[in-house]
Amino acid sequence: MIRRPPRSTLSSSSAASDVYKRQEDNPEVIYAVYSSSDYSFHGIYKSIDGGDNWSLQSNSPNILGRDTDGTGTGGQSWYDLSLGVSNNDENHLFVGGINLWESTDGGANWTIEASSGNGNYAYMHVDQHCLEFHPITNVPYAGNDGGLYKYLDNLNNWIDISDGLEISQFYKLGLSESNASRLIAGAQDNGTEMLTNGVWDAVRGADGMECAIDPYDEDLLYSSSQYGGLRKSFNGGNNWDNIKPVSYDGAWVTPYKIHPNNNNMIVAGYDEVYLSLTSGAVWDSISYNVSGGQSVRTIALAPSNEDYIYAATYSRVKKPTNTGQSWTSIKPGLPNYNISDVTVSDNDPNWLWVTMSEYNASNKVFESSNGGATWTNITGANLPNLPVNCIVYQANANEDLYIGTDIGVYHKDNTMSDWAPYKNGLPNVVVNELEIHYPTNRIRAATFGRGVWDSPLNSSSTYTNYNIVNNLNIYPNPASNRLYVKLKSSDLVHFEIRSISGKIIKEGTLAYNNYIDVSRINSGTYIIKIRVGNSLYRQKISITQNSR
C-alpha cells in the first residue's frame, strides 16, 4: 500500500487531482503528481522509502496547462492526468496533462515533449490519460483521446499505432435513409467522421457532437461541435456553412432534430428552443424560459404531428401547448433525477418515453400515453443500476423499445414483462445514441470508446423499402417527358417529387405500371419518394428539358 504525501508536506491544502507511479526496478521509489484546485500543476513529489517520506521535486512550470511553454494558468487534470516512470532509470519521467512533458532529473526540470500544435516538439494528440513503459523493452507508450502512441527512440518521435483499434468515443450519429452504407458520427476530440462503403473519413474537426443526414439527400449533412457549433454541408462534407441559430453556447452536446417527414423543419435546443422551416437558413425562437436557465439537453419530435415538440433539460420536460411560445411542463409525476433522453411513438404524438441517467435501480425508464399528463414506471427489475443514456422506439406491431446504458443495449416490447439484454457480440461499453435504419431493418449504436456498432432489429418493421425495391423500376433517369414507375405487383403507388431543399414539386397516385408526367418540371436534380402500403422508397432522379 502506498502512503500518500500528508497534507503538511504539500505546499498548499488546496491540492486536487493526483496520480502515483512506482519505479519497477526499485519499488521504494514512488512519484506523485498533484494538481491545484484550478487543475494547474501543483507539484511533483518523490519518495525513496516506499512512501513513508516525500520531498517536493518541482512545482513549475505549469505542465498540466494548455500552453506548451508552461505559462498560463489552469488545466484539466480532472479529465487528463498521467505519469510514467522508466523501468531502468528512476529519474526519467513523463507527465501527461493536456500535453506531454519529460524530465530526466527526477522531476526537477521539465521540457515539452509532445503536443498537437506546431513547435519544437513531437506531434501527439492532446489529453493524456495513461503512460506506461514496456516491461522488457522500456519503450514508453501514451494513451490519449486520439488513441495509442509509441515512442521511436531512433527518430526521437512518437507514432500513432491506433490503426485497426475500434476505440473512437462517439457521442452521436446520423444515418442516411437513402444509402445504407453511409453514416455520420461525432467523436470526442476527433471531430465528425463519415462512413461510406466501409471507409471512414474525417469531415470536421474539434469535438464532434450531434449529426444528421437529410432523409432525401445523402450529401446534405448536418454536424455540430462542442457547445452547439451547428453547420451544414451541401456536398457530402467538403464544405460547411454555419447555421447556428444563436451567438452563444448551448450544452456540451447541443441537441437538434430534423423532422422525419419534413426535411425543411429543424428544431434545436440552446437556452430556448429554436425552429427553422428553411433547413437552417432562418431560425425563430419558439419558447420563453423553457429551460429555466439551464441548457436544453434533448429534443424529440413526433413523426405523426409536426406541432408536437418535446424539450428536456436535466430537470425539466416540456411540450408546447400551441404553435406559439407557450409550453407546458410535463415533469410532474417523474422523479427528481437527471433526464437523459426522450422519444415519441411514430403513430401517436402523445405516447412518449423518458430515460434517466441516474444510479437509482428503480427509476430508469418512464412511459406516458397522454402527452405527459401521467407517467408509468417501466424500469422493471432486470436493468443494471447504471445510467440509461438513450432510447429509441421502433414502429412495428410489437412496439419495440431499445435503450442504451453504460454497459450496452437492452430491449423490451409489448409481449415482454421486463427488459432483456440486447447485446450479443457488443462489448460492455457506454452507448450514447441508438438509431434505427428502417430500410435495412437494423439498429446502430454510437458507443463511447468502441466505435459504432450495428445489429439486426429484434423484429421486422412494416416501414421498410425492401418489400418493394427489388420489384420496382423507375426509368428513364434522366427523364424529360415521362418518368415510368413499374411495379411487379398491382398495388397502388403514391409518389412525391421533391426538390433537393425538400419542396414538393409534384405528388399523386399511380395505378399499376404507369408514368408521371415531368414535362413541366424544370431541369435539375430531384428526389422521388414512392410509398406502397407501409413501404417507402426514395431515389435521386435527374430531369433534363430541352430549351424552351
Set out the residue ranges of the language-model regions:
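Short coil-to-beta transitions that initiate beta-strands within beta-rich domains
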Residues: 14-17, 66-86, 116-134, 161-178, ...
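Entry beta-strands of beta-propeller and related beta-repeat scaffolds
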Residues: 26-32, 89-94, 137-141, 179-183, ...
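A recurrent domain-boundary module in secreted/ectodomain proteins
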Residues: 432-462
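Surface-exposed coil/turn segments at beta-strand junctions on protein surfaces, enriched
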Residues: 25, 88, 261, 304, ...
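C-terminal outer-membrane/trafficking sorting elements
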Residues: 467-475, 479-548
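Asp-box/BNR beta-propeller loop motif
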Residues: 14, 37-66, 99-124, 145-168, ...
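Short, small-residue-biased leader/transition segments that mark boundaries at the very start
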Residues: 4-19
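Active-site lining segments of carbohydrate-active enzymes
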Residues: 35, 50, 60-92, 98
